[in-house]
């Protein structure tokens, strides 16, 4: 692969869209695909679709091209080589990866309207802008509650209409992606589907942002390449999520790998959030690991909340009560402010 750096046009202040289009046409004529990534001071175009090495010399003399660089990493579009500044992903009417801590909260599974609306009221009151809830549930047992399907998505759409919250919910197959695209604001690809490559390609063809969860035994490079699959299809609005990995430890459902947060941020411009609910599996661990995730630099949290966790049809052991959730939000926001202040002090 290769990256082309375009210089701002004189008297225009930034790269002229017509120049970007011209360069992409030349790339397409060579049987390749160009991916434009506008930045603050420049526009980069990533080139994919090549079977072998791309010779940057092909593009160096094109109008507007300031530099052409060969990319050596197996992933191109997610790389900081392509976009040094951080990407901010718009989800509905709010943002993930910007200056505000993103909090995505709600029940593991949509069970009924009353349950969902009770949680949504608290989530809205807390100032969070995103609501999670599963309408399609991948369960280890075929006899466990599998979710309400499209009826559940309709309830989530009602939550958006009433509370103004942006809906994040999982799709397990192509039909699910079509339905979530219709009713939701962000499509979640779960840990078990992180390497379902046909599903990743299909997700890359949608117009909705994708929340990609790390597989339970995925390496950093496998995680990065899964995101690359989505972006290579043209969907550049990808949010990464650490949700715990499988280890020998038995004291928690999974092991939260918080070291992945700075590792990801060193390599990619994509935002990354953490899921301390699935990452621990225990109610009493969620708040400490949420605080730690924010302290280590995560862009947001995804938290499971239920009005009566002991009656939950799915993952009740890791759900917070409404009161516990309110306490968590207050604490993590203070930590986020401290982290932001300390980063400013050291730069």
Show where each model-derived region lies:
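Hydrophobic faces of well-ordered beta-strands that scaffold small-molecule active sites
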Residues: 101-107, 129-133, 167-170, 185-189, ...
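Alpha-helix-loop-beta-strand connector modules within alpha/beta enzyme cores
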Residues: 145-169, 202-209, 258-273, 318-341
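Active-site segments that bind and position negatively charged phosphate/pyrophosphate groups
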Residues: 1-17
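Active-site mouth loops of central-metabolism enzymes
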Residues: 100-118, 141-147, 166-170, 190-191, ...
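Catalytic alpha/beta core domains of metabolic enzymes, predominantly
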Residues: 91, 206-305
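Catalytic beta/alpha-barrel core
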Residues: 148, 163-175, 185-198, 209-220, ...
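Glycine-rich, proline-tolerant flexible connector loops at the mouths of alpha/beta enzymes
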Residues: 132-150, 307-317
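Non-catalytic terminal accessory/regulatory regions of metabolic enzymes
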Residues: 18-103
């Amino acid at each position: 692969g290769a990256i082309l750096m375009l210089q701002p046009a004189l008297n225009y202040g930034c790269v002229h869209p017509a120049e970007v289009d011209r360069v992409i046409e030349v790339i397409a004529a060579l049987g390749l695909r160009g991916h434009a990534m506008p930045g603050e001071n420049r526009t980069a175009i990533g080139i994919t679709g090549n079977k072998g090495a791309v010779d940057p010399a092909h593009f160096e003399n094109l109008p507007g091209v300031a530099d052409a660089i060969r990319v050596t990493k197996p992933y191109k579009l997610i790389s900081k080589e392509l976009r040094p500044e951080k990407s901010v992903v718009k989800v509905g009417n709010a943002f993930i990866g910007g200056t505000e801590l993103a909090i995505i909260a709600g029940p593991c599974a949509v069970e009924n309207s009353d349950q969902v609306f009770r949680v949504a009221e608290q989530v809205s009151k807390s100032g969070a802008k995103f609501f999670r809830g599963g309408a399609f549930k991948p369960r280890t047992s075929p006899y466990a509650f599998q979710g309400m399907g499209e009826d559940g998505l309709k309830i989530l759409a009602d939550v958006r209409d009433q509370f103004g919250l942006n809906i994040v919910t999982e799709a397990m197959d192509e039909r699910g992606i079509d339905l979530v695209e219709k009713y939701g604001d962000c499509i979640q690809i779960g840990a078990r589907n992180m390497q379902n490559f046909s599903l990743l390609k299909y997700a890359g063809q949608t117009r909705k942002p994708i929340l990609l969860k790390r597989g339970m035994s995925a390496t950093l490079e496998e995680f990065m390449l899964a995101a690359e699959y989505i972006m290579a299809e043209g969907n550049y609005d990808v949010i990464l999520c650490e949700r715990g990995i499988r280890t020998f430890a038995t004291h928690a459902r999974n092991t939260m790998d918080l070291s992945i947060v700075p590792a990801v941020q060193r390599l990619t411009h994509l935002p990354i959030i953490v899921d301390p609910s699935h990452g621990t599996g225990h109610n009493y661990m969620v708040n400490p690991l949420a605080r730690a995730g924010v302290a280590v630099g995560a862009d947001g949290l995804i938290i499971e909340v239920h009005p009566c966790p002991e009656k939950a049809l799915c993952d009740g052991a890791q759900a917070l009560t409404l009161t516990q959730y309110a306490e968590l939000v207050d604490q993590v926001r203070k930590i986020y402010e401290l982290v932001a202040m300390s980063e400013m002090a050291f730069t």
